[in-house]
Amino acid sequence: MQISLKWIKELIDIENVDLDDLIEKLTLGGFEVEEILELEINNEKQIALEISSTANRSDSLSIQGISVEIASLFNKQPKVCKYFNSSLNWQQKIKNLTTIRTSKTECLMFTAVILEGLEDLTVPKWIQNKLVSSGIMPLNNLVDFQNYILLETGYPFAFYDLDKVYSKVRTPTFSLSIEKAENGSEFFASNQINYKLDNSIFLVQANNIPISIAGIIENDEIICHSKTSSLLIEGSIFSASKIRQQSRKLAIRTDRSARYEKSLKSTYLIEALYRLISLLRISNPSLVYKFHSSNKVLEKVLKPIVLNYKTIVEILGPIKKRTNEHLIYISPETVTDYLKRLNFKFLFDSSTLNWEVTIPSIRSDDITREIDLIEEVGRLHGFNNFLTMLPQIKSVGRADFSYQTRKKITSYLLNMGLTELIHYSLVSNETFLKNEIKLVNPLLSDCSTLRVSLLPSLLMTIQENLKQGNSILEGFEYGHVFSGNIETTLTEIEYVGGIFGGTKIKSSWFEKGQSLKWFEAKGKIEKLFQQLNLGIHWRINSQTYTKKFLHPYRSAEIFLSSGKNIGVFGQLHPLLANKLGLSSEIYLFELNLELIQQSLQQNKLTIYSQYSVYPKIVKDLSFIIKKNIKFDELEKIIYANGTEFLSQINLLDDYKGEFIPEKHTSLCLQLTFQSNKKTLENKEIDRIVKNLKRVLELKVQAILRE
């Protein structure tokens, strides 16, 4: 909004106020000065300011409104315009008018006035000058009066040619109403465009003849022209949301609709109407006005807001600091003065230091809570006049269990050499997985579905990194994955996924690089769960969604000791690796973070065992068994028969090849024996191993190898 300082000075005495001081006060008060304009009007130099206000301060979008704000900031008394007092006797007249039919929620006030005896439509020169100083080119017709009132008071008025209205209704009298348009009806507007309407659009009608789309634009057949001698003036307050909805639907925005969209109050509508008629009477002293009809919906009674001095001090802080570290805060007397400046009615309780403040209706949209009143006090005092101090922390926050779990996992993965990555939860439908959770109205085709796994995004990142000529990237990610139906049973679970391997590792410069093997990669995942103190076991992968990107024979599901499936681990499928141009010796994992957290919370008691000071005895055990026998089963049998001295079992080798029968495999196990009470003897351990061999022969038909 462009405002002329000369016009402002007519309403407030700011002759002695420095321009820089004015700009600083306005900016700190929430009205940013975007540009300073130097104008020359009738050989007189003037200064204008381009000001923007926040969305909730629609009351300041006029010369009168911004003048009241400047008066509050500089503790000046604004001049009361004569027409404010002169229009008071209109209030009773309007109450006795014909009530029009209208929507209580969409039209908050409606007043119509008839003017007759318009002979001279010339616009006074001083009005034209003020329009120019506000960035509006005068047209020297009725539109200038509309624009001037909009600038001065903030209220938009609609003008209709009364003679044309009479010719349309074909009766000497007519009634006004606000009705919904009929579906399929048409409206030819003053901008020469024909609009097709439906029943969501409201129309202002005279005897059921549409004369305007409510709050937006007039009917082309009843607009004013240079020979208009009588007027029907509409002054109304419409719901901001309704006007916004209609404007968007019809793809039309006018000065009227733009003003309604920012919300208006009916507080000074009658005064603005009186001012408009007074301006028209300057060139038409014999002008006759008659009230036609009116309707006002009673506004809600606003409850007082209690403002507490202690809260003001806590929020805004001190204004000064003495040398003895004593802090000085804004005084209750100063707060009272600021409330008076803002024209807020209040009752002050000196015993409790509370103000019971009644907000004027024109500020009811932006001041609804105590914190809003505190902001007003801060604005008038100047936020830059408060000391910048950090608040005292009463209690130190604790890291919750979720954070602690993440920290443990992240620490291990970072130590593995992995980098934390972040991807969008919205992905393209063209991934390795069939994403059936589609968005109804996606912004981009690449972000049209919700991801059902973290792994496709990780693979695409590795591929893109290699395309840029970089080395293989090993990384992990925390993120939510989705399942179910987006309309009914959509579930969202947090997972941690990762990708590693694919590079040749050298122990020294002259040796040939070695790729990460399956058991080494699997061992890294087992080590993670050892760090978390969680027992797991492995099962053959039966997850259908992983078959497209995990190796059919080198992938497995991970289960907790409780039997809950918490994720999957495997090597990249060779076909997909070839398609993406990646190494097939890349490994992926995806773990249910929520289940891991639940399991860790259940492990509340940590049991520590004494470290043995006695030596260990290690024995190797080799045998051939059928392929379908799981290692878990063997482990249970050996631990059950290895006595209390058996402390650890390690799988050293799994061999399939020459001299091994079909559908069989050769295993080599390393058994570690140790006692907490004595030094074990070899003959003692030999008896245990001999018994283990016998048990394995009986239970799993193991063929022992010497």
Swiss-Prot record:
Keywords: Aminoacyl-tRNA synthetase, ATP-binding, Chloroplast, Ligase, Magnesium, Metal-binding, Nucleotide-binding, Plastid, Protein biosynthesis. This is Phenylalanine--tRNA ligase beta subunit, chloroplastic. Tetramer of two alpha and two beta subunits. Its main location: plastid. Its EC number is 6.1.1.20. It holds the Pfam family FDX-ACB. It comes from Phaeodactylum tricornutum (strain CCAP 1055/1). Belongs to the phenylalanyl-tRNA synthetase beta subunit family. Type 1 subfamily. Residues 300-388 form the B5 domain. Its cofactor is Mg(2+). Mg(2+) binds at residues 366, 372, 375-376. It comes from the Eukaryota. Residues 612-705 form the FDX-ACB domain. Signal peptide: none annotated. It is found in: Plastid, Chloroplast. It catalyses: tRNA(Phe) + L-phenylalanine + ATP = L-phenylalanyl-tRNA(Phe) + AMP + diphosphate + H(+). One of its GO terms (cellular component) is chloroplast. GO terms for biological process: phenylalanyl-tRNA aminoacylation. GO terms for molecular function: ATP binding; magnesium ion binding; phenylalanine-tRNA ligase activity; RNA binding. Binds 2 magnesium ions per tetramer.
